[in-house]
Regions:
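Short alpha-helical transmembrane segments in multi-pass integral membrane proteins
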Residues: 1-20, 78-143, 187-243, 299-368, ...
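Short runs within selected transmembrane alpha-helices of multi-pass transporters and secretion channels
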Residues: 71, 139-158, 166-174, 195-208, ...
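Transmembrane helical elements of multi-pass membrane transporters/channels
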Residues: 18-37, 139, 173, 202-206, ...
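Helix-terminus/linker motif at the lipid-water interface of multi-pass membrane proteins
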Residues: 32-50, 120-127, 183-190, 250-283, ...
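N-terminal transmembrane alpha-helices
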Residues: 7-44, 58-73, 77, 102-109, ...
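Small-residue-rich hydrophobic transmembrane alpha-helices
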Residues: 50-110, 147-166, 273-337, 373-395
Length: 450
């Protein structure tokens, strides 16, 4: 199996780094695309259009977070079966995961499209950007089936330790997205509709690339005969692994929506500042997220092989990698935050100075707390990979409570400065839960293994 990577053998640090690097590069590429997309929208359509795209970002985090989290959860039993070398069982999980994901895709797409405008009203979307925000969000909801398809199939590939191919697919999809942005927005002049259509088509393209690759190179994943049968127990385990992970993102998303709703009430300038800062923040924080994703596969395979000591060694290695990266971000963000934010606005705009100053402040405050975020992602994904998604979901509840508290009490007093502390307070709250939770899970697994 030349297209797979057994993470139960070899040096843990090397395995984690080799798996995480393509993920990190892929997501950085995605975030660069999102930054380019926001820059195109902000500079060529206007600050109002940038705010319209950003006004729905927290909603998309909730919806897409549920989709992506669920798909990541569905891949955990597959990674564990692969680690245990039980390939027939692995393929049966693949067949049942496809069924569950199809149902989720249809239900979510129908419901979100029907309630699109009502959702925007709930988050206090300013009236002057409501129409553009509605058009963009509706197109994003139509993208849900393709997003689920890509994340599910890419999750299957990563469960086998192969993170390179999904990275290549992200490169292709991101390049297509940028080309479509230029064509639809700058050439044809479609406005925010062009940005939405470009995203939809590029997601479809990435899903098709996964299908072709699996059929050609990873036939070990393709179910045959009785492996295709519906199995209640497997569906139950998939739901038990996937739904809590999906809900974790959605619960976290509720807190982010509360925070964005409080920020939206401050006015269009602050919506634009929040949008610009979040775009760049995700560019830097996706590294932490993908170290965590690597840990989920690493822990999943090693639990399947019952090599529990490798899990502790892997977590320690991941923390050291995270701290080294944090030092790098400090050297970039602290001195250059203002310059990065200037890419999103037309300097001739009367509001450009306020947008840049507030967005840069958001970036610097968040940067101080990146080690807290890094520990959060490492422990959360490790717990998920070890098969305890319910506990990781509870950390999302802690984040939600923290962000809601900031939205209700801190933002009214300190305005945008309060918004800047929404994420750090949430990260600290989650870590206070995850540290003892990880210790509990590891000790429980050791006890059962003995």
């Amino acid at each position: 199996m030349t297209h797979v990577n057994d993470m139960t053998v070899g040096k843990p640090t090397a395995k984690i780094v080799s798996f995480a690097l393509p993920l990190i590069m892929g997501y950085i590429l995605q975030q660069v695309y999102l930054i380019v997309d926001a820059a195109i929208v902000g500079r060529w359509i206007g600050v109002g259009a940038l705010a319209a795209v950003g006004a729905s970002s927290s909603i998309m985090f909730l919806i897409m977070g549920f989709c992506n989290g669920s798909c990541a959860g569905f891949s955990i039993p597959i990674a564990q079966s692969f680690g245990a070398k039980d390939y027939s069982k692995m393929r049966a999980y693949v067949a049942n995961a496809l069924r569950v994901a199809t149902v989720i895709a249809v239900v979510l797409t129908v419901i979100t499209c029907i309630f699109c405008n009502r959702i925007l009203r709930v988050v206090n979307t300013p009236e002057d950007i409501f129409h553009d925000a509605s058009v963009f969000l509706f197109l994003q909801f139509l993208t849900i089936p393709f997003t689920i398809a890509f994340n599910l199939l890419a999750g299957f590939i990563r469960a086998l330790g192969n993170s390179r191919q999904p990275f290549y697919f992200l490169i292709a999809a991101s390049l297509l997205n940028v080309l479509l942005d230029v064509l639809l927005i700058l050439v044809i002049g479609l406005g925010v509709e062009g940005a939405g259509i470009a995203t939809l088509l590029s997601q479809l393209f990435s899903a098709l690339l996964c299908v072709v690759y699996i059929r050609k190179h990873l036939q070990v994943l393709i179910p045959t005969g009785s492996e295709r049968a519906y199995q209640d127990k497997m569906v139950g385990r998939l739901l038990n692994a996937g739904i809590p992970m999906g809900l974790q993102f959605s619960i976290t998303g509720i807190g982010i929506i509360m925070l964005q709703s409080a920020n939206n009430a401050l006015g269009t300038v602050y919506v634009a500042a929040f949008t610009a800062s979040m775009r760049v923040k995700y560019l830097f924080t996706c590294v932490f997220e993908n170290i965590g994703v690597a840990m989920a596969t690493y822990c999943g395979q090693n639990v399947g092989a019952w090599k529990l000591q490798r899990i502790i060694t892997g977590v320690r290695s991941a923390i050291l990698i995270m701290l080294a990266y944090f030092v790098f971000t400090m050297l970039i963000i602290y001195p250059f935050a203002d310059e990065m934010m200037m890419a999103f606005v037309d300097n001739s705009s009367a509001s450009s100075t306020a947008i840049v100053e507030n967005a840069a402040m958001f970036m610097r405050i968040a940067n101080y707390f990146y080690p807290v975020l890094g520990l959060l992602t490492i422990l959360r994904y490790s717990i998920q990979g070890m098969g305890y998604s319910n506990l990781s979901m509870l950390s999302g509840v802690m984040e939600m409570i923290a962000r809601c508290g900031v939205s209700l009490w801190i933002v009214p007093m300190f305005h945008f400065l309060g918004v800047c502390y929404g994420d750090p307070v949430a990260w600290v709250s989650a870590d206070l839960f995850l540290i003892p939770a990880f210790i509990y899970v590891y000790r429980r697994l050791r006890k059962h293994h003995v």
